[in-house]
Swiss-Prot record:
It comes from the Bacteria. It holds the Pfam family Gp_dh_N. One of its GO terms (molecular function) is NAD binding. GO terms for biological process: adhesion of symbiont to host cell; glucose metabolic process; glycolytic process. It catalyses: D-glyceraldehyde 3-phosphate + phosphate + NAD(+) = (2R)-3-phospho-glyceroyl phosphate + NADH + H(+). This is Glyceraldehyde-3-phosphate dehydrogenase.
Amino acid sequence: MAAKNRTIKVAINGFGRIGRLVFRSLLSKANVEVVAINDLTQPEVLAHLLKYDSAHGELKRKITVKQNILQIDRKKVYVFSEKDPQNLPWDEHDIDVVIESTGRFVSEEGASLHLKAGAKRVIISAPAKEKTIRTVVYNVNHKTISSDDKIISAASCTTNCLAPLVHVLEKNFGIVYGTMLTVHAYTADQRLQDAPHNDLRRARAAAVNIVPTTTGAAKAIGLVVPEANGKLNGMSLRVPVLTGSIVELSVVLEKSPSVEQVNQAMKRFASASFKYCEDPIVSSDVVSSEYGSIFDSKLTNIVEVDGMKLYKVYAWYDNESSYVHQLVRVVSYCAKL
């Protein structure tokens, strides 16, 4: 890994929604430099999609393309178009971290191709295929990363929103069991119009339907908060918004805190990555947020019947920007190892 007194060199494999937003975020980081991008799309198209973003607005930088060089103001970035990560020149460019954001190389075997190409570490911007790969959520368990971890998963956007809620409730009150629901903006995995898809619900037009589908966040939470392993299940409702989502967590607790006590526990956990919100916000208010999770204190509630209590807590997130800033925090943390 990079020495602590020098800038770490990053390559991005896959320049889609996450890859481009990671690039935007890293432009402002003094200790991190994006050296290269690998994507099968033509560089001119990548440049256009980097500059103009329907959800997050225009990138106010001068962007040009010459041969296989993407130039942003005075900064030059190499653009490669290689299907096999093992053939990428990561050793030649002294790459410290590869951000693997294609969604294709999420197994240990796939991600390790970047290591074989000379990269020193790989951070997967998705849940990993194997549980043996360390899964981290910044500000919940990121300090478990060691210098020996060469492949890391930054989990999913929903897990990054859910994990602080589970961590706080488990630590302060103990979770017996529960379920979670994410009301989630539609994504590129869905169909714009009715068209074939392995998931028949995702086959339906994303912009005009509420689409029930799966989420791995509830089961993956045990990789981040081990004490909650096996205690949660959940699902997703994809809805017709471009970005901006909310998690509902319903749990039975070992203790019997009041709404105020639950909220105060969340407030104590607030940080640069976890916001405690007292305003009556809606999804558009969290678009482009840098917080991984935004706790909505106004929505905390309890249902009590015959002495049994069901607790509901809610947190917002921009399923693109919130996740990207969490991932970038993990990258910056790895630079210190």
